[in-house]
Design a protein with these regions (language model features):
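Conserved FAD/dinucleotide-binding core of flavoprotein oxidoreductases
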Residues: 6, 13-19, 23-24, 28, ...
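Conserved beta-strand termini and adjacent loop/short-helix elements that scaffold enzyme active sites
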Residues: 43-45, 60, 116, 137, ...
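Histidine-centered metal-chelating micro-motifs
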Residues: 77-78, 98-100, 119-122, 207-208
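FAD-binding beta-loop-beta segment adjacent to the flavin cofactor pocket
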Residues: 184-211
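Conserved catalytic motifs of the protein kinase core domain
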Residues: 66, 131, 198-199
């Protein structure tokens, strides 16, 4: 295992821009508190999309709604994308698994990146209470039977084996340090897919899901939302053109990082 860097992000701050790290759940809480509750409909199961004079959405409860525009930000397994592109809208397994957990009282208050053979992990602060996020990406091939077993990723023995795989090549005893550990298989997009129906916009992971080795997920979602806002405000049609160009750049860097981070040095 090799520690590659400490990043003090405060050095990039100025009077108008400040960089920070935070827990994803806290960001979601912030948004939910600031969006009127009557504008959010939970447990809406989309089953069909039709484009007539307006875009018509049909839901599992047999209700339907019409819209001028649809912005789909429903994640890696986007239901919108699967309706539009059928099986071609499904992502593929990246032969990697992510571990996410929490560490208390870590000795370094900066962002720390550690590289090892076939894995890497990042530790970064999420608040002023000496709590840190731990995120690791581990190369792991799975057979079809394992992929279809959703209980596998909640199995304590499976998760402990992954932690031991890292700990055995690290100076950290991660078993004792990492709390609230969770495990996720990583899926990425197969290719770019642009809806033929007018005024339907895919954004975030619903548009394209990257290998998670460039810390780009949230930043690209925010950037894409800004691009789309400007596109609609100016009545232009450059959104997908700009997104594909930028996404190709980010995807190539992320794929290269994933390869470089997991190199074995003998």
């Amino acid at each position: 295992l090799m520690k590659i860097c400490d990043i003090d992000i405060s050095q990039f701050n100025n009077q108008s821009n400040r960089y920070t790290t935070l827990k994803r759940s806290k960001l979601i809480e912030f948004f939910l508190k600031n969006i009127p509750s009557q504008k959010i409909f939970f447990n809406s199961d989309l089953i069909d999309i039709n484009n007539q004079a307006k875009i018509s959405l049909k839901f599992r409860n047999k209700e339907s709604e019409e819209f001028d525009y649809i912005v789909a930000a429903d994640g890696v397994f986007s239901k919108t994308k699967q309706i539009l592109f059928k099986k071609e809208g499904l992502p593929k397994y990246f032969n990697s698994i992510a571990l996410r957990g929490k560490i208390r009282d870590f000795e370094n208050s900066d962002i720390s990146l550690y590289l090892g053979p076939n894995f890497h992990f990042v530790i970064y602060p999420i608040n002023q209470n000496k709590e840190f996020n731990f995120i690791s990406i581990i190369r792991k091939k799975l057979i079809e039977e394992e992929m279809s077993n959703r209980d596998l990723f909640n199995d304590n023995t499976f998760i402990e084996n992954l932690l031991n795989q890292i700990s055995s090549k690290s100076k950290f005893n991660l078993d004792e340090k990492v709390e609230e550990i969770k495990c996720f298989p990583i899926f990425v997009s197969k290719k770019f897919q642009i809806p033929t129906l007018k005024n339907i916009f895919l954004t975030g992971d619903a548009f394209y899901s990257f290998p998670p080795s460039f810390a780009q997920g949230a930043s690209q979602s925010i950037e894409a939302a800004n691009d789309l806002f400007n596109d609609l405000e100016n009545n232009s049609s450059n959104y997908y053109k700009k997104r594909i160009l930028k996404t190709k750049q980010i995807d190539s860097r992320s794929t290269l990082n994933h390869f470089a981070f997991h190199l074995s040095i003998h």
